[in-house]
Structure formats: C-alpha cells, structure tokens
C-alpha cells in the first residue's frame, strides 16, 4: 500500500476514534445509566464492563485527535486498540457464542469492534512499527 493511501487510512481511523470511541467513552463516564438504557444493557452485564466503562474508548478518542496531527507517532495506540478489541472478542464474546448465549445488544458492539480491528490492521504501518531502532536511539531521552 502506498504511503498516501496508508496515511489516509491512519487519519480515517483517528477520526473514527475521535467521533465514535471518544463520545461513547465520555457518555459512559458521564451518563452510564443513560448509555445502558440506550444500548439495552442490564446493570452489571459483562459486555458493558468489558468496554472498560468508558475510560478506554474516551482515551482512544483523545489520542485519535493527537493522531490526526502526528499519525506515525500515534500508530502504536491503534495497534493496542486492535489488540484489546480482538482480545475482548476472543475472551468475552467467543465463549458466550460457544455457549449460545450472546445477548442481542452485543451484536452492534461486535460489528463495531470488528470494523475497528479491520480498519486498524489496514491502516497500521507494521514495517514502521516493528523496524529495528539503532542502539543510540534507545539511549536518548
């Protein structure tokens, strides 16, 4: 993928975090009962608590704003996001699915997480993220 296309994907994923993850996280922190009612989530449900109660999505929204200015430097955050969403799907949703107990309100979350994972995997400059750093770079503050 050429550099221009990858940069557009990176910025697109940062925008998604600013306008989707950030507001969802903020709303979960400020008005959790309203968000539970909107999403149809019963209090104490593991899917809701698996979201990190809003702090994690809000953090990704804030970092997404930074990523629009510094796309390459913030790329590790998108890697972390892809990993945590993947682990959530594998560790929380998959076991529920295997038991046949995935609740209906989890479906939009599964779709959203899957789209973010795919978008991040497409956008991430893996060769840049995993490039070897010269030893002197490690010693600099």
Predicted regions and their residues:
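Structural signal for membrane-spanning alpha-helices in multi-pass inner-membrane proteins
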Residues: 28, 64-68, 92-96, 120-124
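Physicochemical signature of membrane-embedded alpha-helices that form the seven-helix bundle of GPCRs
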Residues: 13-16, 49-52, 76-83, 108-111
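Juxtamembrane loop-transmembrane helix junctions in multi-pass integral membrane proteins
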Residues: 1-8, 40-44, 48, 69-72, ...
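Membrane-helix boundary connector in multi-pass membrane proteins
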Residues: 90-108
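Membrane-interfacial, low-structure loops and terminal tails that flank and connect transmembrane helices
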Residues: 1-7, 130-141
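Membrane-helix boundary elements
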Residues: 4-47
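Membrane-water interface at the C-terminal end of transmembrane alpha helices
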Residues: 107, 111-138
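Core segments of alpha-helical transmembrane spans in multipass integral membrane proteins
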Residues: 22-23, 45-69, 82-90
